[in-house]
Amino acid sequence: MKGDCYYYRAVIVSLVEDGDLRLENNVPDPLIGQLAVGQEGFVPLHSILMPLVSMPFYLLFRTQGLLLFNILDCMILIVLIFKLNGLFFSHVIAFSTTILYATGTLLLDYTYNYSPDVFSTVLLLAGLYLVLRGKYYWGAIPLGLSIFAKIPNVPLVVVILLYAVFIIWKGDGTNRSIKDDFRKKFTITSITAFIFIVANTPFAYSNYLFFGSPFVTGYQRMAVAGVDGQAVIVDHVNMFNEPLLKGIYQVLFDIGNGILLTNPVLILAFAGIFWIKKVKAQDQMYLILVIGLIQFIMIAKYDAWSTSHFSNRFLMAFIVLSSVFTSNFFSYLSHRYSLEDSIPEQIM
């Protein structure tokens, strides 16, 4: 297991062997920035959602079970890439892009892992896909859980939900009375918001148990060793100090972690952006572009942007979302050279 994976597994080990979530006896050194200072000792810095979901795999097959869980997670992510691209393009193009991303991006390397980034990207992509299909109630569940899985998903989820609210209140063009129309839109919006809040309740409750507040996370209480060897608390909020232009260059072109060098398919995605206006569902394409850029800018500013064993796992959602622009480039080529590519009916 590479990187943070060891500490996600430590959560399961502590629950199974000790019956608690105090991890100082389950890791070699509690003061290397992988645990948090809780009310009653050192507790998980990272989300406990993936360990809880994958615990049955550990109970059945131990560590190998977690690797199996990750493989299944990657398979779900690949299916979601296909489904998302299928909203805009023919199955042939969607399938071609999916295979390209499954084999020619960082996803291939992170398949043999126990990756929280794959897990959180699955939840984010599932929620986005359901919202784009107009299934707001169902979409609110994985979107809420994606925040529990990875706190940096917050701004991405907020933008997706704002888009959902905009579409709900934009209306369907029917001739219902203004009163009935308002009532329906208000009901849909309220139920969606309620489901989203409920989906975030486990996250808030775990924060309350660990840190005494539903709004304080492990990333605000990271434990590191001070000069005297005592625990010092570091807040991740204060770790976004990279100059933007420098950060963009590093994130793109760094030898080991630059996403352009390790995911060259992004060149095709960049080209596909210029033909967004060829797609009927332009608003959805621009939504995907915006949430991808938000994540990109966040990580470009992040001091620890290079702490991935290969490519940049923090930008996994950005890379996966770029697939629709790669498909758009393929669609442009197919039309340019008179190859058949029919647009799915649901976006006509």
List the model feature ranges, each with a label:
Residues 101, 164, 197, 279-302:
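Transmembrane alpha-helix segments characteristic
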Residues 65-89, 121-122, 126, 274:
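Transmembrane-helix motifs of polytopic, lipid-linked glycan transferases
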Residues 109-119, 209, 258, 311:
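Short acidic/glycine- and proline-prone juxtamembrane loop motifs at membrane-interface regions
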Residues 43-55, 59-79, 110-114, 255, ...:
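Loop-to-helix entry region of an early transmembrane alpha helix in multi-pass inner-membrane enzymes
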Residues 80-83, 99-103, 119-139, 143, ...:
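Specific aromatic-rich, kink-prone transmembrane helix
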Residues 159, 187-272, 288, 292-299:
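Membrane-lumen/periplasm interface segments of specific transmembrane helices
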Residues 171-191, 271-290, 339-341:
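Membrane-interface helix-loop-helix junctions at transmembrane boundaries of multi-pass membrane enzymes
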Residues 260-282, 289, 323-329, 334:
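Hydrophobic, aromatic-rich transmembrane alpha-helices
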